[in-house]
């Protein structure tokens, strides 16, 4: 016969990182946008903790809530033993958009072609709404969800705005 060996309960290699290092939150604002990526196969978040539960609370699923003004550290403890932390600053004011990314400066569409714009706001906890506007809706139309549609040949600008920040996209329809 042949000899078979098996390793049971092999140690997990501690890898992984959070999508943010720090976030602002308004008092009573919650966010579930903090996530862990790059985990080793089989690794998972075992617990979430807050360094000061009077300032920031965090649920078992990683939903973070600002309770009162101040700073606290939220830590995700992985099954592999690795700890990942971020700083949460709780403020009284609305969380404003500091930048808009994830959009190209130039796009080309065919007539009747559609494309969904997916702007990424920084910080991820921004409370300011995103709005969209076309400089010429006869050439390129845009709806409130950021879906642009090529209407006829030509070019127009789409303005993506959140708070005082804006991003311009030049769209050419062929």
Mark where each language-model region is.
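Extracytoplasmic soluble-region selector
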Residues: 1-174
């Amino acid at each position: 016969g042949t000899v078979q060996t098996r390793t049971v309960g092999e140690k997990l290699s501690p890898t992984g990182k959070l999508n943010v290092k720090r976030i602002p939150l308004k008092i009573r604002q919650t966010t579930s946008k903090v996530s862990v990526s790059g985990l080793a196969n089989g690794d998972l978040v075992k617990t979430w903790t807050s360094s000061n539960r009077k300032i920031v609370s965090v649920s078992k699923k990683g939903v973070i809530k600002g309770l009162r003004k101040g700073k606290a550290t939220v830590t995700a403890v992985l099954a592999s033993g690795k700890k990942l932390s971020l700083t949460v600053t709780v403020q009284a004011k609305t969380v404003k958009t500091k930048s808009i990314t994830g959009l190209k400066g130039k796009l080309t569409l065919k007539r009747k072609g559609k494309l969904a714009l997916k702007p990424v706001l920084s910080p991820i906890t921004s409370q300011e709404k995103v709005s969209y506007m076309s400089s010429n809706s006869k050439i390129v139309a845009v709806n409130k969800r950021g879906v642009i549609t090529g209407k006829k040949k030509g070019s127009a600008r789409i303005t993506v705005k959140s708070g005082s920040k804006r991003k311009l996209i030049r769209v050419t329809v062929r």
